[in-house]
Amino acid sequence: MSSMDCATFPMHPKMDEQLARTFVINEEEEEKHIQKVQNAFLYYGPYACQRLKRSMDYLNSLSGEDQIMLAKYRGHLECVRTCIDRNQAVIREILRGRVLYPTDEATGDPSEFDEPPPNVRHGDMDQIDIPFDEADVEPLKILKAQSTLKLIARDWSTEGALEREQSYKPIIDSIVAYFKHSDFELKDIKILVPGAGLGRLTYELACLGYSCEGNEFSYFMLIASNFVLNLCDNENKYVLYPWVHQYVNNLRREDQVAPVRFPDVCPLKNPPKGHFEIAAGDFLEVYKTPNAYNCVATCFFIDCANNVIDFIRTIYKILVPGGIWVNLGPLLYHFSDVSGQNSIEPAFEDLCIIMESVGFVIEKSRTGIRTKYAQNPSSMKQSEYQSLFWVCRKPDLFEEQRGKRKASREPHDLIVREDSEEEGEQQPERNETEEKQQLKPLATANCETEIKEQPS
């Protein structure tokens, strides 16, 4: 497919009339926030080089004998500097595509991203020791820019395939099993992916033929995903060094400067079968229409709420009767112990009570799903979650009227560890006729669309 044939994927603010008015009122404030995110990307290089300079300065202060023994280490630090510069060059490419919404006008001269920030001479280590004005750039936001590079590796490189297999495959498999292409017109199955991040899970589901909408609030994610989805025109065109900021737990020098190519799949040249879009906005603010989606898929998302009950209620509301919610992830609870933020941190057994109280039927649940998140595969320190996985169903109207909802169970009855299943154990199959009846309003039977296999 030539570049002229490439599709583009809509990325827009999801809003109703009331929210649109608020959006206009807050547009100036929103632009200031975007500017801070942009500044964090622009100051990525100087900030990373400040850390590098500390190591280099200390190395230069050592005795001549010590420096002789560290000659290869010095060469490695120079290589680190080169990798930081190359990362910054990719970031400038990402920022050239900062316009997220079709209605936006170009934001200034693209060449503004060709040069380092003021007071920094590119390639001159001595000029990196500059003050960071938190009015322009916050160190915490620069760390988020670093994390964004790691997430590009997780979602859009061959090196991230294992993590995607751990996190996305259970979700995809459950959706495919529930919405079989032999029973439904897949293009009529509407799936929402809140917390879509860089969009890979949403893209993979759309490739199977489903109508998929991702939702994301973070401008770090939106800017980067817009670049991958709408501006990358070839596989593995760009090279990042996502682990260059990790100075510890390196077995070999090369592990810190290992390159990662992206994207491993070019969405422009491989457009999905089903409808695919990314909507920007706060999940709780913009998704209020009842009975709108056949499926909600969440991955590493529900613990991003101050009050997880708000997320669960909203998911229940927007699902059609008979629709399902598939979730995988830990309970990190991002606002726990954050100054100025309120937070509740229910355990899984509490979540089971909440889900059933809201009205969900818990069809399947597992614990102990081993999942890593943006980990350097060569690091001596490997962190992983024992994640939760569940499939919940919103009862159809017939069930609610007849009171056929499943009997209440004790929370501990729902806690089944992944490694406790015997090999080959079969799970009870759902009644397929009942499944079709539940989703009949938004799904037409006998779809001829073939399901594309999930990349391994």
Swiss-Prot record:
Superkingdom of origin: Eukaryota
Region called Disordered, residue ranges: 402-456
Residues the record lists as binding S-adenosyl-L-methionine: R154, G195, E216, D282, F283, C299
Pfam family, one: CARME
UniProt EC number: 2.1.1.22
BP terms from Gene Ontology: carnosine metabolic process; cellular response to amino acid starvation; cellular response to methionine; methylation; negative regulation of TORC1 signaling
Ranges of biased composition (kind: Basic and acidic residues): 402-418, 427-438
Biological function: S-adenosyl-L-methionine-binding protein that acts as a sensor to signal methionine availability to the mTORC1 signaling pathway. Associates with the GATOR2 complex in the absence of methionine to inhibit mTORC1 signaling, but dissociates in the presence of the methionine derivative S-adenosyl-L-methionine; S-adenosyl-L-homocysteine binding does not induce dissociation. Required for mTORC1 pathway response to methionine starvation. Exerts a protective function on developing egg chambers by inhibiting mTORC1 signaling under starvation conditions.
Additional record remark: The name 'unmet expectations' refers to the loss-of-function phenotype of female germline cells, which fail to sense and adapt to low-methionine (un-Met) conditions leading to their degradation.
Name of the protein: Carnosine N-methyltransferase unmet
Protein's organism: Drosophila melanogaster
Gene from which this protein is expressed: unmet
